[in-house]
């Protein structure tokens, strides 16, 4: 549709199923005309989802992927892609972690979200964040927050509500919750 043609979208991608879902959603958005960039915080993204996203024109940066085609980690290039996105604003899909993750985000993921977190709280920043299943870095079952988390404007979760979507302090980082 014409209303999304060229709209900037940033995918924050981890190695689990949420990362795969994020890549697949990004491929659909790119196919629909959005300008989609994926930044990987893993050296092991879901291979089928990654290929699907790339086949639909998603630009990929991060672990194992660089814009020049080299197959090595370039965190500086991935962070630069996040900063370039931030200069335009748009939609972020947070698929860094899911229900299998525990503890705070790993350093590579923290580096990717740092410029976005610094941009401000939901409603006060030039972007909107949709968390895939849960805001990455929140305690899935108990709602703990042990490190930086990119606060979502909306969290789209699957099957049922998780503890982090209902319990403080994580609940305050979820935005509107859709099951």
Per-region residue spans from a language model:
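YjeF_N-associated NAD(P)HX repair module
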Residues: 89-179
């Amino acid at each position: 549709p014409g209303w999304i043609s060229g709209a900037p979208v940033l995918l924050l991608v981890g190695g689990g199923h949420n990362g795969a879902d994020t890549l697949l959603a990004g491929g659909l958005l790119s196919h629909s005309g959005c300008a989609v960039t994926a930044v990987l915080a893993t050296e092991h993204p879901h291979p089928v989802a990654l290929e699907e996203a790339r086949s639909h024109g998603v630009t990929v940066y991060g672990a194992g992927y660089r814009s020049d085609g080299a197959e090595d980690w370039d965190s500086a290039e991935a962070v630069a892609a996040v900063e370039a996105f931030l200069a335009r604003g748009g939609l972020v899909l947070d698929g860094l972690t899911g229900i299998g993750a525990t503890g705070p985000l790993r350093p590579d993921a923290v580096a990717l979200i740092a410029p976005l977190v610094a941009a401000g709280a939901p409603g006060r920043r030039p972007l909107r964040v949709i968390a895939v299943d849960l805001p990455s870095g929140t305690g899935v079952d108990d709602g703990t927050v042990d490190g930086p988390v990119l606060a979502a404007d909306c969290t789209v979760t699957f099957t049922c509500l998780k503890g982090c979507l209902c319990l403080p302090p994580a609940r305050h980082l979820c935005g509107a919750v859709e099951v």
